[in-house]
């Protein structure tokens, strides 16, 4: 019988007027068996925690959470703990049981003032802006400054179940061109650069130094030294009911506006604009057979999934998709990844 894996820690939960947990922030987490209640360390949230609702209608409540990593998600606090574990690099993608995560997470209005409940957002937005303006006027009066107050504006980043990673976890050695395009639960190894058009979903990410200019879908992992070109995409498991998790090996390149519905092994390249799925018919290039006029083998993309040293191209003369042997993989520019 395998030993149960657990993680634990103090979180600060945002709870709305209906008692719904909108988010939980964990500044620190621990792996292993949780201490007994009498041995638990104290939290250090101080005045960040408040049991009286603020202008958003939100209370911030300290919660001590123990997560069973191999069990389905039990509640929102459990979901946020597992998402934090991945973004903190304490658990790699596809190693935690995330079953039920969508059902346990509330849809939230994410703003520069923190999370709001969707149901009463318009009224709460006015309350926050009014309270902020009044506080600014009071400060100006006490400081002997002109009475004009800057306009306090609630800016909405999105309405979603998942927040931006960067508001909860800032991993070291990483560059992010646009914070909105990396969800909490993304795993970004040191040396990763996510450009402005890149996107990394939760339970997905990079296992080494990587360049991400395209989309890394849920469940997808990218190996060390690989490059996801601008506009490129990798099929995930959230849409269409698919169960197969695709991945990219080391020193591989998914060209600009290319895409895959299969896994790439090490030292592979998919040329720009080429999309390969499991059912794509691919011709195996053989120079000797071609010279002798013999027919070339044709296979489905699924048969090449995960294999190393392949160059996938579309023959510009006859239009067929070909797989050719490739001796070496790509090398990233080291200067771009000293983060």
From Swiss-Prot:
Enzyme's top EC category: transferase
Subcellular location(s) of the protein: Cytoplasm
Name of the protein in question: 2,3,4,5-tetrahydropyridine-2,6-dicarboxylate N-succinyltransferase
Disulphide connectivity of cysteines: none
Gene Ontology CC: cytoplasm
HAMAP family: DapD_type2
InterPro entries membership: DapD_actinobacteria, Hexapep, THDPS_M, THDPS_M_sf, Trimer_LpxA-like_sf, Type2_DapD
Family: Belongs to the type 2 tetrahydrodipicolinate N-succinyltransferase family.
Gene Ontology terms: biological process: diaminopimelate biosynthetic process; lysine biosynthetic process via diaminopimelate
EC number(s) recorded for this UniProt protein: 2.3.1.117
Catalysis: reaction(s): (S)-2,3,4,5-tetrahydrodipicolinate + succinyl-CoA + H2O = (S)-2-succinylamino-6-oxoheptanedioate + CoA
SUPFAM superfamilies: Trimeric LpxA-like enzymes
Self-association and partners: Homotrimer.
Upper taxonomic lineage: Bacteria, Bacillati, Actinomycetota, Actinomycetes, Bifidobacteriales
Keywords, sorted A to Z: Acyltransferase, Amino-acid biosynthesis, Cytoplasm, Diaminopimelate biosynthesis, Lysine biosynthesis, Magnesium, Metal-binding, Transferase
Pathways per UniProt: Amino-acid biosynthesis; L-lysine biosynthesis via DAP pathway; LL-2,6-diaminopimelate from (S)-tetrahydrodipicolinate (succinylase route): step 1/3
Biological source species: Bifidobacterium longum (strain NCC 2705)
Major localisation: cytoplasm
Role summary: Catalyzes the conversion of the cyclic tetrahydrodipicolinate (THDP) into the acyclic N-succinyl-L-2-amino-6-oxopimelate using succinyl-CoA.
Active-site residues per Swiss-Prot or TrEMBL entry: 213
Positions that bind Mg(2+): 180
Annotated succinyl-CoA binding sites: 215, 230, 233, 256, 271-272, 279, 300
A GO molecular-function annotation: 2,3,4,5-tetrahydropyridine-2,6-dicarboxylate N-succinyltransferase activity
């Amino acid at each position: 019988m395998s030993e149960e894996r657990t993680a634990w820690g103090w979180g600060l939960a945002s709870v709305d007027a209906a008692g719904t947990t909108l988010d939980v922030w964990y500044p620190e987490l621990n792996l292993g068996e949780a201490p007994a209640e009498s041995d638990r360390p104290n939290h250090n949230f101080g005045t960040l925690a408040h049991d009286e609702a603020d202008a958003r209608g939100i209370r911030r409540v300290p919660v001590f959470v123990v997560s069973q990593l191999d069990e389905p998600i039990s509640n929102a606090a459990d979901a946020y703990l597992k998402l934090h574990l991945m973004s903190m690099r304490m658990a790699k993608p596809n190693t935690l049981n995330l079953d039920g995560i969508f059902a346990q997470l509330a849809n939230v209005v994410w703003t520069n003032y923190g999370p709001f409940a969707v149901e009463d957002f318009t009224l709460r937005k006015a309350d926050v802006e009014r309270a902020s303006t009044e506080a600014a006027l009071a400060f100006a009066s006490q400081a002997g400054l002109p009475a004009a107050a800057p306009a306090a504006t609630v800016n909405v980043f999105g309405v979603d179940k998942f927040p931006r990673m960067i508001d909860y976890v800032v991993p070291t050695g990483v560059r992010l061109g646009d914070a909105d395009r990396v969800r909490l639960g993304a795993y970004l190894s040191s040396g990763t650069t996510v450009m402005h058009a890149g996107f990394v979903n939760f339970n997905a990410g990079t296992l080494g130094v990587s360049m991400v200019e395209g989309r890394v879908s849920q469940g997808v992992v990218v190996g060390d030294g690989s490059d996801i070109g601008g506009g490129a995409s990798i099929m995930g498991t959230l849409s269409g009911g698919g169960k197969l998790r695709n991945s990219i090996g080391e020193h591989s390149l998914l060209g600009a506006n290319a895409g895959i519905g299969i896994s790439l092994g090490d030292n592979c390249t998919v040329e720009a604009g080429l999309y390969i799925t499991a059912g794509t018919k691919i011709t195996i290039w053989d120079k000797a057979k071609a010279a002798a006029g013999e027919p070339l083998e044709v296979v489905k993309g699924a048969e090449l999934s995960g294999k190393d040293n392949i160059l996938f191209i579309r023959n510009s003369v006859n239009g067929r998709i070909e797989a050719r042997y490739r001796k070496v993989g790509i090398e990233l520019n080291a200067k771009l990844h000293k983060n």
